[in-house]
Amino acid sequence: MKNLKILLVASILGAIAISYAVADDDGYSKNYKNKNSKYQVSPVKNSLYKEECASCHFGYQAGLLPKRSWEKLMEPKELENHFGDDASVDEKTRLTLLSYLTKNAADSKGNRSRLSKKLDSKISRYSTPIAISETRYFKREHDEIPRRLIVQEDVKSIANCVACHTTAQKGYYGERDIKIPNYGRWDD
């Protein structure tokens, strides 16, 4: 009888331990290969976008904003004052970039990224953010980070994703890959 009680307690404790491990599974071991990871968007593969946009700043994945945001950002007058810089391009280039961005936007039919869908669901249909950092989802995910860690020389801005998200270039924004300069690993 005593052995049966020990076996029963061990089984219960084992089941509890397994449930914690399953609950903590965020797809990390599959993070770059699993397109359905809740932390991943499709990485930038368009060479023109890399040349024209990602040569000046981090190449934000198209799946981080809805079509209407990319359409607004790519308007000629917006490009003339692109966050304080003149990012004007010729019309053919502008239309090619716009096509790439809207076809891969968070709300595009072909985009199957869970993160893109989540980002899009948190943006009001009456809102057209032109910066990812303006979105409600982004603000909620970054609200606990002290300002001093954001404005420091090695980060400079909340818009500098790659400063802290070590796998952002690959489109992966999981917590396990966050390392804030002069602070270390960040974990909510």
Where are these regions (language model features)?
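Bacterial N-terminal signal peptides that target proteins for export
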Residues: 1-8
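Sequence context surrounding c-type heme c attachment/ligation sites in exported
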Residues: 22-54, 59-95, 99, 105-106, ...
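Bacterial N-terminal signal peptides
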Residues: 9-17
